[in-house]
Amino acid sequence: MLSTSGSTGSKKFVKISYENIYENTKSIIKFLNINQNHKTITTMPPFYTYGLSIINTHLYEGASIVVTDLRAIEKNFWKLMLDEKVLSFGGVPFFFEILKKIKFDQMYLPSLKYFTQAGGALKKDLIKYFQLNTPI
């Protein structure tokens, strides 16, 4: 049993089989073209399904994971992203609301290639913000 993040309401526990985890991992790796040269950073606990999915995909391919307990609202989180040359990160809708508030579009992150989102739909204004204001 794994916990969802609760970003669409209250947390839920889901039962996921080994086969589901394996197939999900392979599918994400293929879609995002994750390989051993890839590097991501933790933004969610590994006991959430989405957080574990990010860890599984990168470990399966021998990619790197920057493990941190820093949060996106902390300047040191972004310094770590820059110093470690992180290529991607994931977040739930609330995470992306925070990014807008802390002026993510003004940050210098030359290594960042993409970010992923799960846990519910992004509001239309957030989608537009990231489409218009990020060079990714």
Predicted regions and their residues:
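Short amphipathic alpha-helical segments
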Residues: I16, I29, S53-I55, K100-F104, ...
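Conserved AMP-binding/adenylation subdomain of ANL enzymes
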Residues: Y22-K39, F47-L87
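Nucleotide donor/acceptor-binding cores
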Residues: H38, M44, K113
